[in-house]
Structure formats: structure tokens, C-alpha cells
Design a protein with these regions (language model features):
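Signature of Gram-negative outer-membrane beta-barrel scaffolds
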Residues: 214, 376-594, 629-633, 640
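Outer-membrane beta-barrel translocator/receptor signature
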Residues: 90, 107-109, 121, 130-139, ...
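C-terminal beta-signal and adjacent terminal beta-strands/loops
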Residues: 387-394, 712-715, 776-784, 805-858
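Outer-membrane beta-barrel proteins
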Residues: 122, 174-182, 205-236, 240, ...
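Periplasmic-side early beta-strands and strand-to-turn transitions of outer-membrane beta-barrels
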Residues: 156, 165-166, 172-174, 186-290, ...
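Membrane-embedded beta-barrel scaffold of Gram-negative outer-membrane proteins
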Residues: 304-308, 314-320, 324-332, 592-608, ...
Length: 858
């Protein structure tokens, strides 16, 4: 489907929508409900606010079986949420912009706020959602009101406040496929005339749907627990205080990975006695020699204070303290061969402590409403990572280098270096016994810390220019400072070898031995000839026109140096510090054409501070290598890379229309959005490449329609059309390695995404019933830039449905099914770990269904 065809289709829908009020007047159905919006830090309605925002209300979330933030993408086409190799590595993307997974030093571009409190990492927002009023998704840069981490958009989760009027509650039980059991309960009510409370809890357990044929737990399971308590104080009409405390825990085996293309390394896995399921993306089966571990604990407390100083002014304070602990250990080769140590093979242990404080002063006059505020953010991150070889990695490396244990080039190097040392020639300074390289227990361990402090000053004013025209002006000044430390312990002997030097030594030694025999055992004569001859042979670089063994043959083994040693910092050259500041702004003009239709035009900017690479792939910039050498800090076989990515700055220009009649509403946004310095983090098969794209832009349109053609039926359509492009990305990563991606289309961004729903309500006896169907479509797109589109493309065509009954006594029953047509698509893809020529990917969840029973009481 072309963009022009899609645009014509949507314009036809818009035209039909404008005709609808005339027909609706004849049928006289019920009116559309008014939808509240508070994510802009003041209360308004969806149709009045001149901002591109999607609002999901509690009833929609319940009927759609939305259990955590990841499920929101099925109802908001502009939102994409992708889970990667663990439960907490999740990317949030709006309009094609966003990142933040796979590295604790990379903050998200989409800010997630729960009851006004920022969740700095996606793992802290993935618990089962508590009692909800609504979820609001602000599309486009929102840094004017939200600061440094809203350059692509904001997800605002609003939960119900405790009641001061009456006690109420509910309890529910869900049973579903894969032995799922979900229990939820809550109670809400007054403790006195001025104090209310609420308490809610949930337990969610489900077996995995991705079988481990090597034994052990199936992957893709759920095992979650959460509890949340609130106190609400209203000592007077002018003052109220809301205190929230929450705790959640997750312990799951996640996530199933499929072999998309079995390259030549697959034979090596089989030769070692290992297994894999080749070329089968949707078999939902694999081989793992140990079960992945995903453990999370998230807890926090917040206090919101509101004071109506007078009829024209209000003070708000929101204080929060949060803690996130995350431990992961996964079998990243995704085979049953014991290439990694099962206890510490590929582990990540992260602790994050976050404190935030926001003050807002807002007010209104006859001709304007205004708000000023300040925000402070203080976060400490401690991370320990490790990648440790298992019992079979040496044999695997021997096979990959074309030999068998005892005869491969790795053994030749070990024996050659040992001979050089024993012969008194220049060497690495120690004997290298056979079997040293890739020994069990070798690897790297990294410990990183990051102290991040930031503050913002912001303000916004809405000025009435007349009865129907409003001008909005806003600005935000943000400062962000990060202090980072990195310390690595490297025991991977082979990765620490400089193969340029090693190759020269081996050639020198071979020439010396030959000349020693030719000169009758005279070492002086042999040394003179060997020195002159070996200089002409090595170590010259290898290239396409000068491949091994014509040049230094040892260089052909560099792809096996998965874990090259690093340089710890801070040091005398790298201070481990970034300081960023930026002023973002918003300007918008809104005009009420009629009482039912308003239009707006606006522009705004967003900002995201520098992101640090807190992983084994954090390496000094090439520009710092000379100074590091002069300071004597270089280590053998060091390579350049990136320590951090510089800030990204976004700009959007937008035109919108919002219309609401009795039975139909229409919201339309046309936008042109770009990000300078987009922070890209791509997995290359042995590590991650963190880099700034010069510029990424997207032109697009978004449309939301709600329609009640009759009292018993409601239909919705939400669609997003995007035309994305890397305007400049010379430092990108393609299928063959480093590549200039300028002028290409970013992968994973669908040109067309839409969600259509239909809901029919009816009565059966004394029960009110409904039937709801959802259809989600996303057109075909390459999944990721460094995996060929022929191997990993994605097209979505999914159907969800639910059927429910509610009785007057507060009892409800709901049958639900997700992906009932068993649609198959990839969530993401990547070059297989240490398996050149092979590709892997994450398949979507297959069809699930279940029954929910719920009882309300008061």
C-alpha cells in the first residue's frame, strides 16, 4: 500500500466523518462521553487541548486486557514498545523515535510517569498496572513541561485516588492459557472525614510458551507480584496531600529467541554435541543449556501536596524516592552447547536509586492561565556485568578456525609464542601453554557507576487573544551532569593479544629457525638474516586485495577477539564527566472555529542529555588514543569506540484539528519532526554500537475517530502514517558492518499503522453485556538495519476480542482472546552472538485466551 493510497483512504474517512452529524441527528443515539486530560499538568478535555494526545480510559484497558505498559501499543498506533532479551530491556518509541534499552546508561527518549512520578528506566514501569483511571500518550517532544527525557513523547499513567465518601473494592480472578493465574484485589474508602486510603495487590503467574528442548523451564513465563497503598488527606478545602507507596517483584524466564538463519557456525555447535532449531522463527522451540534468569524488584514512595493559595493561584509539590534492583543472566548463544558458564555466563546486576522533586505554581486571570515550576533529579546507578566462557568455548573456537583441538591456528600461536620465549627471543613475557586461549572461566567483568544530577526551570502561559483564539508560549531550561566510573577485570587471554605484534614475532621466529639451520647453528648470522627478512614479511595490514596469509595470517583471527581489554576511567585523559544544558520551547496558536471544531498550529523542541555506555563495549574515542598513549595508559590490543553519545535535540512543527459532535469525534494531526544527534544503540553480534545519528526526520499524519452510529454500537479508528528517513548517519551499522546510512529509511518504523475497534452492547435478562473486537495492522518493514530484510521483516495483522457480562449485584465475567488469529511477526532481530553468518530474533507471543471473573463491592 502506498502512502498516497493510504492518504486518500483516510481523507475519505475524514469526509465521511464530517457528514456523520447530519445522519446522526435522525437516529438520536447517546452522546459521546467527555474525556479528561491532565498530562499537560493542568486539567482539560481531550477535544479542547491543542496537543496530539491519545487517551485510554479504564473501561477500554479492562476490556482489552491491558495488563502492563507494553500492551498499550495495540491501542495507540504511534506507540511502539519492543521487549528484547529480558523482561526489563524494553524500548519505548513514539512516531519512530525512541530508545533506552540494553544499557543502564541510556535513558529513554519517551518519558513514563505514573501519578506524576518519573520512572527513569523501562523496567520500573513494567509491573502489572494498578487501579487505573486512564493512560495518556503525548506524541512528539514534551520537554517544555517534562524536561530532559521527553524528546520523543510522554506516557502518563493516572490511577484512582482514595475516596472520602464510601468504602468500595473489587476482587478478580483470571485463568488462561499456559496455566495462567492472575489474582487482583483492591479496597478503597475513608478512614475519617478528612482521610482516605486504598490498598491494591496483584499476583500474575503463567507458564512459558517457548519450549526449551534441552530441558528446564519454558521461556516467556510470567511470575509477578505487586502491592500498592495510598493515603489521601484533605484537612481543608484548600489543602490536600496524597502519599503513595508501592512494591513489585518479578522473577521470570525470558525471553525466547528463534534462529532465523542458520549460518556456517551452526555446524560447529552440532559438532560440539549442541543443538539448535535452525531456520524456524515461529516454532516456539529452542535449545538452552541453562534457564535465563530475570529478577526485578521495584519500590518507591511519593508525596503530592496541593494548596489552593487563593482563587487565582495554586501550589503543587511532588516528591518521590524510588529504588530498582535488576539481575539478569542469559544463555546468549541460544544453543545447548555450553559456550558460557551457566552461573555467570552473561550477567547484569543493576541497582538504581532515584530522587525527584517538582514544584509548580499555577494560576489564572480573566485573560490568561499560567504555570511556572522547578524540577530536580538525582540518580545513582551501580552496574556489574560479566561474560565468562564455559567448558566448550575453546573447542568451538578451534572448529571455527578450521582445525580440531590440538591442531588449530590457536594451538599454533600458543606453541609458537612458547617456543619464542624459551628460545630467548622477544615475546609477550610469559610462556603460553597449549589450551590457554578461551579457557573455562576466562572472560571480562565490568563494574560501572553513574551519578546523574539534573534540574529544570520551566514555565508556560496560555493567553486569550479573543473569544476563540489562544496563544500558548512555554520554555524550559535544563542542566544535566553525569559522573561515570568504569573498571574492568579482563582475563580473556586471546582477546588481549595484539595479533599484529604476535604475527610479527611468529614470522621472525620461523625465519630465525630456518636461518639458524642454514648457517650451521650460528645465532649471530641467523639473527641478522631473520631481522632483515621478517621486516619485509610482517606485520602488514590485511585487506581485500591483500588477504591472509599473504599478509600477517594471525590477523584473520581478530573476529574471535570478542572481549578486547579496556581502559578504566576516570583517568588523566578521560574524566568520566558530561555537562549538558539546553533551552527548549513551545509556541502554539489555537482557534475555535465553532463550538464543536477547533484547529491549532504549533512548534516545539525537545532535549535528551548525553547517554553513557555502561557496558563492556564502552571504549575510548579515537581522538583520545594519542593522549592515552602519551600518558602510558594504553593496554594491549585496545580499539577505539564510544564512551557516550552526545545529546539529542528534537524539533516538531504540527497542524491539528479537533472536532466533536454528539455522536462522532475526529482528531487529526499533521507533523514534521526531526531529531539532531539521535542516540542509536545497535547490537552487532559481539557487542553494542552506541552512536549519534547526524539527523533523523519523520513527516506524518495521525487520525483518531470515535463514532456512535447507534446507542448500542461504538467504533473507533486510530491510524498513523509515517515517512521516516536518516537525513545524515555516516556512523551507522549495516548488514556488512560500519556503513553510511544517510538517505536510507530507518528500520522498524512502519509507514502505516492502524487500530480499529468495534464494541456492541446488549442486555440479557438482568445482565448488561458487550462484545468487543480489535484489529491491529502494521505494514511490512525491515526489522533492524544490520539484519537483511529477506531474513527479518515484520508485518502485523492481529485480532483481539473480548465478551463480557455484568450483573446488578456487582459480578462480572469476561472471556478474552489476544492474537486470536495467531498472527506471527518478529519483535526484533540481531546477528547471532559469536556466530558469524547466523541471525536470531524474538518472535511475538502466540494466541492466548482466558476467563476473568470480577466482583465489585461497596
Amino acid at each position: 500500500m502506498t502512502n498516497s493510497t493510504t492518504c486518500r483512504g483516510i481523507l475519505g474517512l475524514v469526509a465521511a466523518t464530517f457528514m456523520t452529524p447530519v445522519m446522526a441527528q435522525e437516529q438520536e443515539p447517546t452522546f459521546l462521553d467527555e474525556i479528561t486530560v491532565t498530562s499537560t499538568k493542568r486539567q482539560s478535555t481531550l477535544q479542547e487541548i491543542p496537543v496530539a494526545v491519545s487517551v485510554l480510559q479504564a473501561a477500554d484497558l479492562k476490556e482489552s486486557q491491558i495488563l502492563d505498559v507494553k500492551d498499550l501499543q495495540f491501542l495507540v498506533p504511534s506507540l511502539r514498545i519492543t521487549q528484547l532479551q529480558s523482561s526489563g530491556n524494553t524500548n519505548f518509541i513514539i512516531r519512530g523515535f525512541g530508545n533506552g534499552a540494553n544499557n543502564a546508561g541510556i535513558e529513554p527518549s519517551v518519558g513514563v510517569f505514573i501519578d506524576g512520578v518519573y520512572r527513569s528506566r523501562s523496567a520500573a514501569a513494567l509491573n502489572d498496572l494498578p487501579n487505573l483511571e486512564r493512560i495518556e500518550v503525548l506524541r512528539g517532544p514534551q520537554s517544555t513541561l517534562f524536561g530532559k527525557n521527553a524528546s520523543a513523547g510522554v506516557i502518563s499513567v493516572v490511577t484512582a485516588k482514595p475516596s472520602l465518601d464510601e468504602t468500595s473494592g473489587s476482587a478478580s480472578l483470571t485463568v488462561g492459557e499456559y496455566s495462567q493465574v492472575l489474582v487482583k484485589a483492591d479496597v478503597n474508602g475513608p478512614l475519617s472525614d478528612t482521610v482516605g486510603f486504598s490498598l491494591s495487590g496483584s499476583f500474575n503467574q503463567r507458564d512459558g510458551y517457548y519450549d526449551n528442548l534441552a530441558g528446564g523451564d519454558a521461556l516467556g513465563e510470567l511470575d509477578r507480584f505487586g502491592v500498592r497503598g495510598q493515603l489521601y488527606f484533605e484537612p481543608s478545602d484548600e489543602v490536600n496531600v496524597r502519599i503513595i507507596a508501592d512494591y513489585s517483584k518479578l522473577d521470570e524466564a525470558c525471553c525466547g529467541v528463534a534462529n532465523l538463519l542458520n549460518g556456517p557456525t551452526g555446524a560447529a555447535i552440532v559438532a560440539l554435541g549442541g543443538n539448535l532449531v535452525p531456520n524456524a522463527p515461529f516454532a516456539y522451540q529452542g535449545y538452552y543449556d541453562f534457564t535465563p534468569v530475570n529478577e526485578f524488584e521495584s519500590s518507591g514512595v511519593s508525596a503530592e501536596f496541593d494548596w489552593d493559595i487563593n482563587d487565582m493561584m495554586m501550589l503543587t509539590s511532588i516528591t518521590s524516592l524510588r529504588k530498582l534492583e535488576r539481575f539478569e543472566n542469559g544463555d546468549v548463544d541460544f544453543t545447548s552447547a555450553p559456550l558460557l558458564d551457566p552461573s555467570t555466563g552473561n550477567r547484569t546486576d543493576v541497582d538504581i536509586d532515584t530522587f525527584t522533586q517538582e514544584f509548580r505554581l499555577s494560576g489564572a486571570t480573566d485573560t490568561a492561565s499560567w504555570m511556572v515550576g522547578a524540577y530536580f533529579f538525582d540518580e545513582d546507578v551501580t552496574q556489574e556485568t560479566g561474560l565468562i566462557y564455559g567448558t566448550a568455548f575453546r573447542a568451538y573456537a578451534d572448529i571455527l578456525t578450521g582445525g580440531i583441538p590440538g591442531t588449530s591456528p590457536l594451538w599454533d600461536i600458543e606453541n609458537g609464542l612458547t617456543g619464542l620465549f624459551l628460545g630467548g627471543l622477544p615475546s609477550l613475557g610469559s610462556v603460553v601453554p597449549g589450551g590457554t586461549f578461551f579457557g573455562e572461566g576466562q572472560g571480562n567483568i565490568e563494574i560501572s557507576t553513574m551519578d546523574n544530577k539534573a534540574f529544570s526551570l520551566f514555565g508556560q502561559i496560555d493567553i486569550d487573544l479573543g473569544d476563540r483564539t489562544t496563544l500558548t508560549l512555554g520554555a524550559n531550561y535544563t542542566e544535566d551532569e553525569k559522573d561515570v566510573t568504569f573498571n574492568q577485570t579482563a582475563t580473556d587471554v586471546f582477546s588481549g593479544l595484539d595479533l599484529v605484534e604476535v604475527g610479527g614475532l611468529l614470522i621472525y621466529g620461523a625465519v630465525f629457525q630456518s636461518e639458524f639451520a642454514s648457517n650451521g647453528g650460528d645465532p649471530v648470522a641467523a639473527n641478522a638474516v631473520a631481522s632483515a627478512t621478517s621486516a619485509a614479511l610482517a606485520p602488514i595490514p590485511c585487506s581485500a586485495t591483500n588477504p591472509p596469509p599473504a599478509c600477517n595470517p594471525s590477523l584473520a583471527l581478530q573476529p574471535l577477539q570478542f572481549q578486547r581489554p579496556n581502559i578504566n576511567f576516570p583517568n588523566s585523559v578521560e574524566n568520566g564527566n558530561t555537562k549538558d544544558d539546553d533551552t527548549t520551547w513551545t509556541v502554539r496558536l489555537a482557534f475555535d472555529m465553532t463550538d464543536d471544531v477547533n484547529v491549532y498550529v504549533g512548534a516545539g523542541t525537545g532535549f535528551k542529555a548525553s547517554s553513557w555506555n555502561l557496558s563492556r563495549d564502552s571504549r575510548p574515542f579515537a581522538s583520545d588514543l594519542p593522549a592515552l598513549g602519551s600518558a602510558g595508559l594504553l593496554v594491549p590490543n585496545i580499539v577505539a569506540g564510544t564512551r557516550y553519545a552526545s545529546p539529542e535535540e528534537s524539533t516538531v512543527y504540527e497542524i491539528g484539528l479537533k472536532a466533536s459532535w454528539d455522536v462522532v469525534s475526529l482528531n487529526l494531526a499533521l507533523f514534521d519532526q526531526e531529531i539532531e544527534g539521535f542516540q542509536s544503540n545497535i547490537f552487532t553480534g559481539t557487542g553494542f554500537s552506541l552512536a549519534n545519528a547526524g539527523k533523523q526526520s519523520t513527516t506524518g499524519a495521525e487520525i483518531d475517530i470515535r463514532w456512535l452510529p447507534m446507542e448500542a454500537f461504538e467504533a473507533t479508528l486510530a491510524a498513523t502514517i509515517l515517512d521516516p528517513k536518516y537525513d545524515s548517519f555516516p556512523g551507522g551499522v549495516g548488514v556488512s558492518g560500519p556503513e553510511d546510512l544517510s538517505g536510507t529509511q530507518p528500520p522498524g518504523i512502519h509507514e502505516l499503522s492502524l487500530t480499529a475497534t468495534g464494541r456492541y452492547s446488549f442486555n440479557i435478562g438482568n445482565a448488561a453485556g458487550y462484545a468487543r473486537v480489535e484489529y491491529i495492522y502494521e505494514d511490512e518493514v525491515q526489522v533492524i538495519e544490520n539484519v537483511p530484510a529477506s531474513v527479518a521483516s515484520r508485518e502485523v495483522s492481529t485480532i483481539n476480542a473480548s465478551f463480557g457480562l455484568a450483573w446488578d449485584n456487582g459480578f462480572e465475567a469476561m472471556l478474552w482472546g489476544r492474537n486470536i488469529n495467531n498472527d506471527e511477526y518478529l519483535l526484533s532481530a540481531f546477528p547471532s552472538v559469536a556466530q558469524a553468518g547466523s541471525y536470531s530474533g524474538y518472535p511475538n507471543q502466540p494466541r492466548t485466551y482466558g476467563l476473568t471473573l470480577r466482583k465489585y463491592f461497596d
